């Protein structure tokens, strides 16, 4: 059992983006959720990483199989940072989540000032934690300056 500094306790966590932007699964997982084969409410879920502005990433909704491969015992993906941007999430997804039923960890990626701005935007939601995605192996970008972004808002 892991206990966060805010008191949230969890034993199992779903990896960033594995259950989409709402913690309830990608469209190809919905039938498994409906059948009870995937139960998001059993986990603390890290949502798909959000960026300040929309990014196309690698996922194409009309052919997701180009980014997702099933392997024995699971799957791997190269979705990258496909997302519609944090403002979309804050207006279209975040307000409609049941944070009591689905403990959600936010995930953000960006430059230092963007990280601070996005963290403030997500502060209006009942997230159990916030992940700063320091690097995504499918974007070709270098590691970000996460430490300086955190210190800029939390000086010692």
Range-by-range predicted roles:
Residues 15-20, 119, 129, 149:
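A sequence-composition feature that detects small, non-aromatic residues
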Residues 56-59, 86-96, 112-114, 136-156:
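Active-site-adjacent beta->alpha loops and helix N-cap segments on the catalytic face
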Residues 1-103, 109-110:
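N-terminal capping/small domains of soluble enzymes
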Residues 26-28, 114, 118, 142:
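Residues at alpha-helix caps and immediate loop-helix transition turns in enzyme cores, especially N-
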Residues 100-128:
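Short, electropositive alpha-helical surface patch
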Residues 118-144:
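Hydrophobic alpha-helical segments and helix pairs
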Residues 8, 12, 75, 134, ...:
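Functionally constrained cores in energy, signaling, and assembly domains
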Residues 39-43, 123-128, 154-155:
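Glycine-enriched alpha-helix->loop->beta-strand junction motifs that scaffold or abut catalytic
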């Amino acid at each position: 059992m892991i206990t966060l500094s805010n008191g949230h306790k969890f034993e199992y966590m779903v990896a960033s983006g594995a259950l989409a932007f709402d913690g309830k699964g990608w469209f190809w997982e919905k039938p498994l959720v409906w059948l009870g084969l995937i139960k998001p409410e059993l986990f603390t879920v890290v949502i798909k990483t959000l960026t300040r502005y929309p990014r196309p990433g690698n996922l194409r909704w009309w052919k997701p199989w180009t980014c997702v491969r099933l392997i024995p015992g699971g799957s791997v993906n190269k979705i990258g940072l496909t997302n519609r941007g944090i403002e979309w999430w804050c207006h279209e997804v975040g307000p409609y989540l049941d944070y009591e039923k689905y403990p959600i960890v936010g995930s953000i990626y960006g430059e230092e000032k963007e990280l601070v701005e996005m963290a403030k935007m997500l502060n209006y939601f009942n997230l159990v934690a916030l992940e700063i995605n320091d690097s995504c192996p499918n974007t070709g970008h270098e590691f970000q300056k996460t430490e300086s972004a955190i210190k800029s808002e939390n000086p010692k």
